[in-house]
Amino acid sequence: MGVSGLWDILEPVKRPVKLETLVNKRLAIDASIWIYQFLKAVRDKEGNQLKSSHVVGFFRRICKLLFFGIKPVFVFDGGAPSLKRQTIQKRQARRLDREENATVTANKLLALQMRHQAMLLEENNKKATALANASVQNERQMPSSMTLDNSEIKPVLNQRKNYLKPDPYQLPEMDVSFDKLGSSYDPRIMSQDELTQYVSSFTKIEDINLFDFSNIDFDSELFQSLPDTDKYSILSAARLRSRLRMGLSSEQLSEMFPNRMDFSRFQIERLKERNDLTQRLMDFTGMNEFGPSRVVSEKNREYILVKNEGAEGGWALGVISGSTNNEPIIIDDEATKLSSNLIDEDEDEAFYDVPLPSRSHSMNPRELVAAKLKEIKENSFSENQQSDEADYNVTDDLILQLATQQSLEENKKSKELFSLSASEFDKLNSEKKTFEILSTDIPAEDSMNSLLNDEENLKLEHVGDVSNDSLAFAEKKHPENGTSIFMDALPSASREKKTNDLIDPLPFQPMDWGKSIFFEKLKKPTETFMDSKTDIPSEAPDNSKLVEDTNLHTINATVNIESDLDAAKPGIENPIISPLLPVKDDEKDLDLRELNPLEPFENMKEQADDGTVTNPLNVSSDKAMSVYLLSSENAKDTGDIKSESIDAVLPTLETSSPSLSIPTDFQKEASPNKGAAALSSKVEPEVVEKLLDEEEEEMIIRMAEEEKEYDRFVSELNQRHETEEWNQEAFEKRLKELKNQKRSEKRDADEVTQVMIKECQELLRLFGLPYIVAPQEAEAQCSKLLELKLVDGIVTDDSDVFLFGGTRVYRNMFNQNKFVELYLMDDMKREFNVNQMDLIKLAHLLGSDYTMGLSRVGPVLALEILHEFPGDTGLFEFKKWFQRLSTGHASKNDVNTPVKKRINKLVGKIILPSEFPNPLVDEAYLHPAVDDSKQSFQWGIPDLDELRQFLMATVGWSKQRTNEVLLPVIQDMHKKQFVGTQSNLTQFFEGGNTNVYAPRVAYHFKSKRLENALSSFKNQISNQSPMSEEIQADADAFGESKGSDELQSRILRRKKMMASKNSSDSDSDSEDNFLASLTPKTNSSSISIENLPRKTKLSTSLLKKPSKRRRK
């Protein structure tokens, strides 16, 4: 570890050195810190330690040192000092916390991922809910006053809704949770007791083959009383034993049966016994039971294996020919057809198309009614229609032909219907399968909404209750007219297509016909309508006025249109103008009557007989619609409306035509017993044109609003997407932080073991490199080796080496750069006036292997504290001053500098230990336990074979991979040993000054505050690093005690000049003149030793030393 942040302080004094200049240098290497680095740094992605990473790291670094010709000496840590053991214990406590924190972090990771999954699930649920709500809102709501009796159609619909196609890959639910699976109490796995009991059950069973079956009477009552399993086992074992030779060899059998005939008789007896046992087994298993058994099958033929009852026995294969004459002829009668249809229907009902769960929705009442109507239509027109599946697949042309044909047939039926009398009418009514529509009060605005209901089908919008099984009309007497109308369930020309159950929300707002300009024009009073193009036949009775104090309550229409009406739905480009216009007045119930114009259909029938059909109304394809007229009724009467069916076909309109033009000759002949009025109406082109102009303006306004709504929708989606991206980014960032924290906690939890140290030492022995184990600290031993000149430098990344007295340290030797960082203690003294004792003081503040340091104190603040409190007792003075601040007894003078003000703000955060500063820390650094032996080191030759085997055993490297790295290094070593290397010029300058060959680079401080702290520390004269005696004597002689670099450099230059000259009096005078020039211009009478500063120790006895050396 070293001193925290010390490398940052010493970085300005580093020198770059090339690796090529370190040839034949003896370098002491701290091996313990290498192992520590490999343990902490070399890990996998999950933060786990890689196996044998320390061996691989040592091998690579050793090869690099040997390649550059460096002679390393490895030093391992020994026993730790007491102070370090205390620090290690504290760190172990922290390491235990790290292990616990690693578990906590893993739980946090799991919780974060689970929370993320829950957020995604919740977001998906919100989107599904929003989608469902949007689809529900886009659907038109039915009035609350309308009720529906769905007692008949509910079971069928529920059957379709509840049925889901089974997923072949969906596994059944388990009775046991996943937590119990694979555990010791997993019910699928036998426990230890059960396994022991199961094994013991087999060990207790005696081998049945050991018994003698020759004396067993298989027909005895005792044998027959045995269980079937035992009898079968005994018979099987006896039969198998009969095939053996009793375990005797051929020689033994020859001795037992010297006569070959006796041996043959013995074999025949064994054969008879085996056959008897085989027959008993066949009888026991039922194989001998008589009866035919089929062995093969072919059309019109039957193969039967029959047992032969004759004396010859055996089995015979018989063939029975199934010719057509012998086969029965199946007659398809009505009962058979009916039963087959029922079976087919049952088989068809077994499977249904089920919508996707994510897009499905509950069926609203409108869809329930549509389903019921579809069922009624199938029952009513079963002979003229095909099945649903065939109907879904027919083409448009076929639909057109069917619709035209049925409309012609219904035209004929309608003519016959009008020719019937009232009694015949009632009789026909009782025989037809019809249904009842119970209508309630419905606003007129909602009635127009029924015209545009679906993309493909215009369904029945507002209907009443559907009756039960009888599906008959309920008769109701009207108080005013007392008439009943025959209304059919559906127009026979209309054919309902298969609708899509998956109703997606529209990307635009649905058209509200109640608010359109078209419908506003339709809501004019009755008088306006009567004054315009409306003709009421004179045959209509007075009590049957169509428009008299009434409102339009219900328009029931079922229309099947093609996809060419899609444009008319959102854009109102093809409005449907009903011939029935609403009358705004008091709300009253109205009767439904149906217009059935006859003359156009007669013409259509005649044209159809000729082969051509001409639409008198300019209609398109098979689009048909039933229009029901309303007659007034008493408002108080809320009973059911009895409707009798009159088949009619609505004149349909072209989608290309903007309006509906109804000819005036479309009139309904009034019947005396009907009491209904026929209505033929037409709209003037000018009125329609005016309506269309206003409609286009309304459409433009709506499209502009739709554009604005779309922009708002897109912006909301983008904002939501950005929010989701931000949430995802935050999640990824948090996940990355937790993973890094988990890796660091795993790294801090591991520690160096003795096995790692032994493997590294074995590798060094195989390389022939010397290594030693220090008594205590490896850094201290390296410093001692450098002091004894057994090595030329120290290679370590531990800054404690300077505190132990290391003066030449190499750092970052194995990085990618070609330069190594060299730190010299002389540079520290010259540049920053820092010595070993100052570094130890920094260790008290920053923390090291021997002390924990002070919290909230960094390298810059530590330098400022040492500058503010200098001297040997500086740290003690700092402690007293800080205690005054903590207790609140500090005066204003105690906080009179920027540094003290800064420290005053950290009073509650900095905690001083009671033993601070601990003098034992100084003693441990100044006087460590080291080996003082001066025995020189020897370097050997690597053992290639042993290295291969060692790397194979520890790392798993093959011989080829080891040779790829090791052979070039060994070859280069031999080449340098025998050929030699060229000497460089720098080795001749390593006498007194060893720094000339490693020039320093100008350093730019990253922190201005650090630069100021080092500068202030540099200008201060340290009491622990006194000037040399000669410099001090010169300062005493001239009445000034400057410890600055300028004074020292000038005096040293002068002394070199003096030493190069011969001793003479003139030289003495010149020296005196030179020294006088250094003296400040002050009064000579004022210069005395007493006037010098106290902090400088003056020694006048050294004034004559230069002259004495000169005389010698």
Swiss-Prot record:
Which GO CC terms are listed, alphabetically? nucleus
Q: Where is the composition biased (Polar residues)?
A: 1079-1089
A single Gene Ontology biological process assigned to it is: nucleotide-excision repair involved in interstrand cross-link repair
User: Where do the TM regions start and end?
Assistant: none
Entry EC no(s): 3.1.-.-
Q: Where is this region: I-domain?
A: 742-870
GO molecular function per UniProt: DNA endonuclease activity; metal ion binding; single-stranded DNA binding; single-stranded DNA endodeoxyribonuclease activity
- What domain of life is recorded for the organism? Eukaryota
Q: Which residues form the UIM domain?
A: 395-414
The compartments listed are:
Nucleus
Where is it predominantly found?
Answer: nucleus
Region (N-domain): which ranges? Answer: 1-95
Name the chain's protein.
DNA repair protein rad13
What species does this protein belong to? Schizosaccharomyces pombe (strain 972 / ATCC 24843)
Q: What is the lineage of its organism?
A: Eukaryota, Fungi, Dikarya, Ascomycota, Taphrinomycotina
Gene giving rise to this polypeptide: rad13
